[in-house]
UniProtKB/Swiss-Prot annotation:
It comes from African swine fever virus (isolate Warthog/Namibia/Wart80/1980) (ASFV). This is Protein MGF 110-5L. Induction: Expressed in the early phase of the viral replicative cycle. The keyword Glycoprotein applies. Transmembrane segments: none annotated. Keywords: Early protein, Glycoprotein, Signal.
Amino acid sequence: MLVIFLGILGLLANQVSSQLVGQLHPTENPSENELEYWCTYMECCQFCWDCQNGLCVNKLGNTTILENEYVHPCIVSRWLNKCMYDLGQGIDHVMVCSQPKYWNPYKILKKEWKENNSQNK
């Protein structure tokens, strides 16, 4: 019985360590080790992009887009198991941190940039 209990406890510990834990006060600049989580579920947040000279490069991948209204300042926070994105003007997204859902209200504004052809999609 003790072996089963310890096995279950070990599995739970493995799951918890791969999730965001603890409280995160509202911030526009989450730590580097949390960027993958926050930028996966709402990539239009300004902290997900490095923008210079009219082009923005995604910090997690090789995607380059034209700098426009797609990239928005975002405030993210976490309390218990609730993760929240706040885009201002009453636009926010709250999700269970351990069961995240992709959400991007500005998806239609995304304009990818191609090096060979500066035309956008």
